[in-house]
């Protein structure tokens, strides 16, 4: 990659050189296909200008799926077809999350802290898990959260709204690794993680992942995806990763798709509800329901109001929502929520 440090892998190359002395063949392996920074991968060699990784053999996800040693994932990215951002008296409208983010009117972190957005994504993830459990009753779900506070809120949301069990594991827990080991053989439905369940964790019954991390590097995204790819007992086990249609995550998903076998895709829109987003702290949005649609009006107020349910919109953010169902999708699916 361009800008790769010329000194970052000197110790690795020295080690390979020492091992190679007197040996006709030397095999060096790496599970790291690239790094997001400029650091070279240890024990690997680079050539060319700009410096690129030298490989004699590459075994990717597509190979693993075709060899039936990994599950074939569904990558489901949830989007919005009608986003309204109100700044004081001016309203900006966008037809996608990408458009709103690129216009610098919406931040990815806004989606990760907005209760209604999280509720809709988690509801979709829950429905995916229910669908998979029709044939695989021990399947479980993973939520990769962006903060400890968010993780606790999501865990409570799962317990309260889905009547399912949930456990939180985070980097600040003394017994986090023990809790992960217990989860592997338990009947707990969901595990919500902050900086714990990523690289190297082996929990084959995980078949659904809700990606709600603030980290948007391709290596981390693929590492998280790997948590739901591990074959359990059967080779026909489905798995799904659900995330917001943030530009970088779309790019990574499309790259993963290029390596996967082709398959069919079906999308069905079940329901549409309209929300607005306002950034004016002196106003709040109030909703009314008519014929299964939510209509919005903005009312001046000197007080702050917070709502928790879908039909009482939180003041800080809201946007168009559709409930969608995608079955047997093995290609990246960008759905309008």
Where would I find each of the regions flagged by the language model?
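SF2 helicase catalytic motif II
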Residues: 1-28, 32
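Interdomain helical connector at the RecA1-RecA2 junction of SF1/SF2 helicase-like NTPases
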Residues: 38-138
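Conserved catalytic network of the ASCE P-loop NTPase/AAA+ motor domain
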Residues: 17-23, 67, 133-136, 162, ...
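A short beta-strand-to-loop transition that corresponds to the Sensor-1 phosphate-sensing loop
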Residues: 29-33, 147, 194-196, 245-246
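Long, largely alpha-helical accessory region at the distal end of helicase-like NTP-driven motors
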Residues: 111-113, 117-124, 128, 248-337
């Amino acid at each position: 990659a361009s800008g790769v440090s010329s000194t970052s892998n000197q110790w690795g190359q020295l080690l390979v050189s020492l091992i190679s002395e007197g040996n006709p063949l030397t095999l060096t392996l790496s599970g790291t296909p690239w790094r997001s920074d400029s650091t070279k991968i240890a024990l690997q060699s680079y050539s060319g200008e700009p410096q690129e990784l030298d490989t004699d053999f590459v075994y990717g996800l597509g190979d693993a799926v075709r060899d039936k040693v990994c599950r074939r994932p569904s990558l489901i990215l949830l989007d919005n077809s009608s986003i309204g951002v109100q700044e004081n008296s001016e309203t900006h409208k966008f037809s996608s999350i990408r458009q709103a983010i690129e216009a610098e009117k919406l931040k990815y972190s806004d989606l990760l802290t907005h209760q209604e957005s999280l509720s809709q994504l988690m509801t979709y993830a829950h429905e995916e898990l229910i669908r998979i459990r029709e044939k695989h009753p021990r399947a479980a779900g993973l939520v990769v959260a962006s903060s400890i506070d968010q993780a606790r809120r999501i865990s409570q949301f799962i317990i309260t709204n889905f009547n399912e069990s949930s456990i939180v594991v985070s980097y600040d827990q003394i017994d986090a690794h023990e809790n992960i080991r217990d989860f592997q053989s338990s009947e707990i439905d969901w595990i919500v993680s902050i900086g714990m369940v990523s690289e190297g964790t082996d929990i084959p019954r995980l078949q659904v992942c809700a990606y709600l991390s603030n980290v948007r590097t391709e290596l981390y995204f693929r590492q998280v995806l790997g948590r739901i790819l591990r074959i359990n007992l059967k080779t026909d086990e489905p798995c799904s990763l659900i995330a917001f249609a943030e530009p970088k995550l779309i790019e990574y998903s499309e790259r993963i798709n290029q390596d996967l076998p082709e398959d069919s895709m079906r999308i069905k829109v079940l329901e549409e509800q309209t929300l607005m987003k306002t950034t004016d702290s002196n106003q709040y949005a109030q909703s009314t329901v008519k014929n299964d649609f939510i209509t919005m009006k903005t009312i001046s107020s000197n007080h702050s109001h917070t709502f928790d349910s879908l039909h009482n919109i939180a003041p800080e953010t809201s946007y168009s929502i559709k409930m969608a169902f995608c079955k047997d999708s093995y290609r990246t699916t960008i759905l309008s929520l």
